[in-house]
Amino acid sequence: MGQFHLAIRDYDKALRLDPKFVLGYLIRGLALNELDQHMQAVENYDQAINLPPDFTHAFIGRALAHAVLGNDSEAQQDTDRAVELGANREQIDAGLAEITEQR
């Protein structure tokens, strides 16, 4: 888990230097999810989504974080948007189903 904390710290620094670094928000969100900090992960995915271009992986990550939090409606909306952007629905749905079973 220490590596995730280090990654978050490094991306904090990178995002202070370049607040429009979309990939930074995405990766920091992934690390936060791994540390079970799902609300903070959602906030990072929000940041990535609000910056152009539409970043499919941010919608997928946010959908998974919302699923862990029990926000099924939001998870479905993000899944739909990711699919519109070209993501594979079956793969996302499989991840969501696994999360739902673990809740």
Please annotate each region the language model reported.
Residues L26, L30-N33, A67:
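Position-specific recognition of the canonical hydrophobic site in helix A of tetratricopeptide repeat
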Residues V22-L23, T56-H57, R89-E90:
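Helix-start (N-cap) detector for alpha-helical repeat units in TPR-like alpha-solenoids
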Residues D72-R103:
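Terminal, low-structured helical/coil segments at or just beyond the last alpha-helical repeat
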Residues K13-R16, Q47-N50, V83-E84:
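Conserved structural position within tetratricopeptide repeats
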